[in-house]
Amino acid sequence: MVPRTPWHDEALVVFGEVARDAARHFIQWWNIHKVFSFSNRLFILPKTYDDKEELTVHNWKEFLEDHPCQINGQCVRSIGPWSASTKTTETSILNAYIQMIDGAEHFIFIENEFFVTVANDSFIQNPVSETLYQRIVRAHRLGEKFRIYIVLPLLPGSDNVNIVQASLYFIMRSIAKGDNSLFKRLEIAGIQPNDYISFFGLRQYDILMGRLVTETIFVHSKLMIVDDQMAICGSANINDRSLLGERDSELCVVINDIEEEQCLFNGRSVRVGKFFSSWRRRLFSMILGTMRHNENDIDVSDPVSDQFYNYFREVAHKNTLIYEEIFGVLPTNCVRRFDQMYNYTDKPKLKDTDPNQAHEKLKNTQGLVVDYPVYFLDEESYLPSLRTREGISY
């Protein structure tokens, strides 16, 4: 057996017309691949529905703990001639991301396995970074209180060194490495990036066979929640493979909440979706460690205020410093060049020099959140050689 890193994912259960559309997408995909692969498996025929009553699900209590919420949903896809034999390439997932980011009024929360989106780049074509940049610039110009939280895996999920290098290289180029990165473009525009946008990872610790150990939590979600009013969730990563429609086939659901409730954002009363607000609060509570024990009475309902945004960042940074001192974790902002790597990793680690003190310090960590190391190896170029498959593919 090969041990697997801890895993974090988010998903949806949907009923009604949007579920029917998801089924029809699968049928279309299944049938065209049967043709291409000359498989003996049977074709699937979609069921015909005469009215909406047939779509009603009465046995939801068998697989849901709580009563389902009412929402408006729409399936969106990345799909094209090669993957589904369509006449045109469909990029409705990308269109949804762009429209939702541009229309966000208060905050954006993203969990994704990738963040590969570079403006003005000859390789990376999707405009997610440009849209985030323009939304932040607009917030800065108008004096708006606007926040973006992005949670990513601390390392790409692969045991292939070339894949890890290539993925990490382009993620860092997207965030802070080079003049076309999101952070650098904001700084050139006179904007402090962390006033509006922050990147985070997830990490945990435990005692294994009498020794303190730590492990990153691999974020596999493909989720964006906007203003606690709408969301997109599905299979699409934030990269060209998932968003341009000409490569991987993807399916997501865009959801608007119907049931609303009152909430305060930065001291202002706003209407938020009942479903999305509860979903986002649950995620923040898990990330900050307040789901079961909330000794400091932290209110996660307002993601916009300076108080909460700074608290979120402070918890992440405090946790990061503790993990670096005790375990010498990688990746880290302490290592910006290869020649700094060994100096950092060779330093005595508190888990070895004083395990009892290390364990006491680890009790001061809160939740799972840590800083995303946006400046890790930012003075180095580690893109795999173009002679490798991974170097060519990017």
Where are these regions (language model features)?
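Charged, low-complexity intrinsically disordered terminal segments
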Residues: 1-394
